Amino acid sequence: MGVMGNFSQERLGMAAGMNAYSQICIDEAVAWAKERKTFGKPLIDNQVIKHKLVDMNRAVRTSRAWTELLSWKVMNGESPIADLAMLKVHASKAMELCAREAMQILGGAGYLRANSGPGKVERIYREVRVNAIGGGSEEIMYDLAARQLGYKS
């Protein structure tokens, strides 16, 4: 496996990790929204909270499905370089959305540093940019995908 093959594995691994972080954000936000009461009702009963949770799920589920598809392709000898570059961007944007919305749902509790409960979201929120840059920045991934897709003069 050459250098480009290593990049493929790295980007797949990063996408899988970002998907896991995104899911943690969803899980923590749901748990908090069910427990937290506002105006005498659980926070999760608010339409806007449900919409945020659905949007978070949409982002992570599409990212997870794409990751599984590309993992299968790579395991079967394909080298979908453009798709892997786009997946890395998609997974980092999904993670960013999930971390941001989880922080919004958690409110002040989201800023607490801890290794369990809502405090996990604070760490993930800080990790978003590292994951977006590591393995090739979003801008580099866009350029790589564009070249692979033949978008040049």
Describe the residue ranges of each PLM region:
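Alpha-helical interface subdomain recognition
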Residues: 5-153
